[in-house]
Amino acid sequence: MNKKTEIKIEDVCRHSVTFPSIPTTLISRKSYFDLFEEQFETYKVLCLPGAEGVGLTTALAEFAKMHNQYCISYFIDGFSRLAMEPRIIEHSLYVQFAYFDKHFSLMNEDKEIDLSPHIVRVKRRLKSSKNYLYFIFDGFDKIPSTLKDSIRSILTLLLDIDNARFLF
């Protein structure tokens, strides 16, 4: 009996509760994406400037979708103060890490979230796969200064992942 085994590749972007909808009609950004890829060979973090309404969020979402198996994202639209809360951001990252490293565990909502076990597993997985794990963060320039230290501590954990690349 010759049965084919179908391997289902996870679209991690589907599990980002803040992932924006992408318009059906798009401007080609291939040259930008090629430039990002080229820059990621040298730099770990890229920060993209852009005025409101120029399509930066759409470009970031498109780039994330291009790497949907190796991408964790968080988009802040600026309208929801709750979306800027470090605990909410950390929870979203936790869920996406769980889908990425296929290690699901029930999380007690009263307990503090610990990303460390996921980060250890992700580091191992990336080392053996030679792929980058992309982190796409949009709208972080809108975060109030009172929350920046808490969010900085989350990002510092992520920066420890060797094959991680960050796009803000």
For each of these PLM feature ranges, what is it?
Residues 2-36, 103-106:
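Conserved adenine-nucleotide phosphate-binding loops and their immediately adjacent elements
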Residues 37-46:
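Phosphate-binding P-loop
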Residues 46-76:
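P-loop NTPase Walker A phosphate-binding motif
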Residues 59-63, 88-96, 150-154:
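Alpha-helical scaffold elements adjacent to nucleotide-binding pockets in ATP/GTP-utilizing enzyme cores
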Residues 73-84, 111:
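A short hydrophobic beta-strand->loop->alpha-helix junction that borders the nucleotide-binding pocket
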Residues 103-137, 147-165:
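Mid-core helix/loop region of P-loop NTP-binding domains shared across ATPases and GTPases
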